[in-house]
Regions:
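Charged, compositionally biased, marginally structured helical/coil segments
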Residues: 1-167
Length: 167
């Protein structure tokens, strides 16, 4: 990751501004920022090459929200372009868009019941030991929640729901 960043002066300068905004003493957040910068942001650079207009503070805020599990990775990736290149405030975008990560067991219970009911063959596959089936069900839950469900909690709830089901 770091090689990608330091090989491009624009990325290197932007990353330094992001580190400053994050507070360089938090190596886990810095590492997460480097990962998003070297993978997701690099792919957007062809159409946005004026690095001095990139919004490092907003990117740092977005990374902080992701790190603190206030948003999912999918939401972070969806907001990345508008946050960095258009200067959209990520906190405002998340709140106004209803994109905060949903970690309410009660709220997710309905989604879990729906996806299990809609996918009996996949549930059967999971019961027969196919782990990929669980990932499929989690994916369906993420789709129904519009990317706001906490994936690990969703997997946990689906597993528990299936175990409690009568065959």
């Amino acid at each position: 990751q770091i090689e990608v960043i330091i090989s491009d002066l624009r990325l290197d300068n932007f990353f330094n501004r992001v580190v400053q905004a994050l507070g360089s003493d938090d190596s886990d957040r810095v590492r997460l920022a480097a990962n998003y910068l070297a993978t997701d942001l690099v792919s957007l650079l062809e159409t946005h090459d004026e690095a001095d207009t990139w919004h490092a503070e907003h990117f740092a805020t977005l990374i902080g929200m992701l790190f603190d599990e206030k948003i999912t990775s999918r939401i972070a990736k969806d907001l990345l372009k508008s946050v960095v290149f258009e200067g959209i405030d990520p906190q405002k975008a998340v709140i106004e868009g209803g994109l905060l990560q949903n970690d309410s067991k009660e709220a997710l219970a309905g989604i879990v019941a729906d996806i299990v009911a809609q996918n009996p063959t996949v549930v059967s596959d999971y019961r027969n030991g196919k782990q990929a089936a669980l990932q499929f069900l989690v994916g369906q839950g993420m789709k129904l929640s519009k990317g706001t469900a906490k994936p690990t909690l969703l997997a946990e709830l689906i597993t528990a729901y299936i175990k409690e089901m009568k065959v």
